[in-house]
C-alpha cells in the first residue's frame, strides 16, 4: 500500500474545468493542499499560463511567482500549484490587475477583472459555527478561515463580507428567500438567481429553489448555494452573461444576431 501524500496527477484525471488538452503532456499540475478542494480549485500555474497567457511554460510561471508578484487574498504566494478557488482575489501588482475567481454558466472559472476597490474584500460562506476552548465562539468559512467572536446573528449558510487587509468581518448577508445567490456545485454550477423557496428535509439534504433573471426556475441542494447579494443587488461584480444560462437555441439566436449586426 502506498504511504504518504500523492504527488502526481495525470492529465486525463485532472478536473474538466481546467480545460487542459489531452495531448500536450502526460501529467497535470497537482494542486498543493490548501483552502480549496482539489476538484474545486484552479492552481496558480493554470491561471497564469493557460488563462492569462503570461507565461509559456511552468518554468516561467515559477520565475514570476518567485519574484513575489502574485498575491492571493492580499498575501504573496510563491507556490505555483497553490489552489486558488471560488471568490479568491488574485492581484498582480506589477500590472495593476485584480481578478476574482467566479464561475461562468458553463461551470468554469472565468477570468473576471475587478476594480481596486472591489479587490479589498471577498465574500465567504459560513460552513460551521462552533464554540472553542474557553467558550470562544468561532465560525468556519468555505475557504477554511476561522474567525473568532462573530456576530451572534450570523448562522450557517449565511455569507460574510471579509476585509482582506484585516481578515475581519465587515458585513454579512442572511440566507433568506428573496436574496441573490450563485450556485457553486452540481448541474446548475455558475447560475445566478433569487432564492424563492427552501424545502426542509430532516435527515437528508435541504433543497433550495432558485429563479434567474430570465424567469427560469431550478432547484439544487442547500450546500451548493452561495448568497452573493441582498435582494436583487449583488455585492460583487458578475462575469459576462451575469450568471444566466441560455439554452442551445437561445445561444444560437444570440450568436446569429451579433453576426448580423456586425456584418
Swiss-Prot record:
SMART domains: S4. This is Small ribosomal subunit protein eS4. InterPro entries: KOW, Rib_uL2_dom2, Ribosomal_eS4, Ribosomal_eS4_C, Ribosomal_eS4_central_region, Ribosomal_eS4_central_sf, Ribosomal_eS4_KOW, Ribosomal_eS4_N. Residues 42-104 form the S4 RNA-binding domain. PANTHER family: 30S/40S RIBOSOMAL PROTEIN S4, SMALL RIBOSOMAL SUBUNIT PROTEIN ES4, Y ISOFORM 1. Keywords: Ribonucleoprotein, Ribosomal protein, RNA-binding, rRNA-binding. Gene3D superfamilies: 2.30.30.30, 2.40.50.740, RNA-binding S4 domain. GO terms for biological process: translation.
Amino acid at each position: 500500500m502506498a504511504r504518504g501524500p500523492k504527488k502526481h496527477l495525470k492529465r486525463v484525471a485532472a478536473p474538466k474545468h481546467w480545460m487542459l488538452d489531452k495531448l500536450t503532456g502526460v501529467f497535470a499540475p497537482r494542486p498543493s493542499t490548501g483552502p480549496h478542494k482539489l476538484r474545486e480549485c484552479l492552481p496558480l500555474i493554470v491561471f497564469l499560463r493557460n488563462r492569462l497567457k503570461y507565461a509559456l511554460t511552468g518554468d516561467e510561471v515559477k520565475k514570476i511567482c518567485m519574484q513575489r508578484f502574485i498575491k492571493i487574498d492580499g498575501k504573496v504566494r510563491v507556490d505555483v500549484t497553490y489552489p486558488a478557488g471560488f471568490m479568491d482575489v488574485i492581484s498582480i501588482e506589477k500590472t495593476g490587475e485584480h481578478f476574482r475567481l467566479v464561475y461562468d454558466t458553463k461551470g468554469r472559472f472565468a477570468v473576471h477583472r475587478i476594480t481596486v476597490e472591489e479587490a479589498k474584500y471577498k465574500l465567504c460562506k459560513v460552513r460551521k459555527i462552533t464554540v472553542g476552548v474557553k467558550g470562544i465562539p468561532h465560525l468556519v468559512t468555505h475557504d477554511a478561515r476561522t474567525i473568532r467572536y462573530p456576530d451572534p446573528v450570523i448562522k450557517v449558510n449565511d455569507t460574510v463580507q471579509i476585509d482582506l487587509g484585516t481578515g475581519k468581518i465587515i458585513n454579512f448577508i442572511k440566507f433568506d428567500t428573496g436574496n441573490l445567490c450563485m450556485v457553486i456545485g452540481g448541474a446548475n454550477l455558475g447560475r445566478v438567481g433569487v432564492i424563492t423557496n427552501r424545502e426542509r428535509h430532516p435527515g437528508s439534504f435541504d433543497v433550495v429553489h432558485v429563479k434567474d433573471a430570465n424567469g427560469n426556475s431550478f432547484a439544487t441542494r442547500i450546500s451548493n448555494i452561495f448568497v452573493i447579494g441582498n435582494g436583487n443587488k449583488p455585492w460583487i461584480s458578475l462575469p459576462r452573461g451575469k450568471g444566466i444560462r441560455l439554452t442551445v437555441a437561445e445561444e444560437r439566436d444570440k450568436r446569429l444576431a451579433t453576426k448580423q449586426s456586425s456584418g
